[in-house]
Amino acid sequence: MLDAFAKVVAQADARGEFLSNTQLDALSSMVAEGNKRLDVVNKINSNASAIVTNSARALFAEQPQLIQPGGNAYTSRRMAACLRDMEIVLRYVSYAMIAGDSSVLDDRCLNGLRETYQALGTPGSSVSVAVQKMKEASVALANDLTGITQGDCSALIAELGSYFDRAAVSVV
């Protein structure tokens, strides 16, 4: 965002002019959009533990074999690893959301994740379901406009959903 401000200022300075009303309006819109983005990420971050825990509970209710003897989330060590991985995905989705770009999610979280899970024998389809459940919870929080900067958030919510979809697809 600072790059956009610096670019507009540099352009006006090169022309020896004040910023135009059009430029100021565009920058103001960008700030308002950034505030909404921050509000959405803050809601996710503030509720991260509940998002992960409730999504895991819902996954295990649907797929109880995961927590039975021999299941991939059986034993407290494996359960902790599952919850940790879910939290990592949620964290990187929040990074992508704040940046407005999936590259941090792709580069630092998703690239190679499918292969890692395959090597560990972790069912990618179950991980994908867990990610979708976190998406549902996060989108529901984002749709609650309490504490969100006024304005249409539909594009941001769609963007948020797309990051979860990207993560869900990458593990199967």
Curated annotation (Swiss-Prot):
Residues where N4-methylasparagine is found: 72
GO BP, one annotated term: photosynthesis
Protein name, as recorded: C-phycocyanin beta chain
Protein's membrane topology: Peripheral membrane protein
Any Pfam family matching the protein: Phycobilisome
Sites where the protein binds (2R,3E)-phycocyanobilin 2: 153
Entry comment on modification after translation: Contains two covalently linked bilin chromophores.
The encoding gene: cpcB
Listed CDD domains: PC_PEC_beta
Family as reported in the entry's similarity comment: Belongs to the phycobiliprotein family.
